[in-house]
Regions:
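Extracytoplasmic/secreted envelope proteins and their assembly/folding machinery
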Residues: 21, 42, 62-69, 115
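Conserved PDZ fold ligand-binding element
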Residues: 41-63
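PDZ/PDZ-like groove recognition
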Residues: 14-45
Length: 186
């Protein structure tokens, strides 16, 4: 409970957040080097899982996962992931696609961005209360580690209806480095 004066707001803000691990958005087939459809990750990881390490190496970026898979040369990988808050481990053996690249058959992402509103400020802190941050592709509530808040220009407002929430659309200039970030989220 806050026992201090606050100033109500409602100002729009751009939000950028890094996921805690990499989010599995989908598990999908591809054609292997023999032209056959395959999906090494099928039945192992699924939409909404967070891959947090592979062969003992912590994963925080999509590029880290891609590099480990590429360097595997098709050897089985021990994948540690989180599903519904529970840590699990499985083995996945990457397969070579028609272009010679090793793949798992999992579409992943490591960040999310969007627009929100500042609820109130108290001089040094701000609060943005409301709904959780969810992935647009899966609807899964995001597990985030860090991020930032940025200025944004609203370009369109969609009115809400009884079965459809309203929506702000806008543009934010988001640089992961400091220059455009207003506040750090941690």
């Amino acid at each position: 409970i806050f026992d201090r004066p606050v100033v109500p707001s409602g100002e729009a803000m751009g939000i950028y957040m890094k996921t805690d691990g990499v989010l599995v958005v989908d598990v999908c087939s591809f054609k292997n080097e023999n032209g056959e459809s395959c999906c090494p990750a099928d039945g192992k990881v699924c939409t909404g899982d967070y891959i947090v390490s592979v062969d003992g190496m912590e994963i925080s970026k999509r590029s880290e996962l891609l590099d480990i898979v590429a360097e595997s040369q098709g050897d089985s990988l021990s994948v540690r992931y989180i599903r519904d808050g529970e840590e699990k481990v499985c083995s996945i053996t990457p397969e070579k696609n028609e272009n010679g690249a090793y793949l798992l058959g999992a579409w992943v992402k490591d960040d999310v961005s969007g627009i929100g509103t500042v609820t109130f400020v108290d001089g040094t802190n701000f609060m943005a209360l409301g709904h959780s941050v969810s992935d647009i592709d899966t609807g899964v509530m995001m597990r985030c580690s860090t991020g930032g808040v940025y200025t944004t220009d609203i370009t369109n407002i969609s009115k809400s209806y009884s079965s459809e929430p309203g929506r702000l659309q806008g543009l934010s200039l988001i640089h992961i480095s400091e220059p455009t970030r207003l506040r750090r989220i941690s």
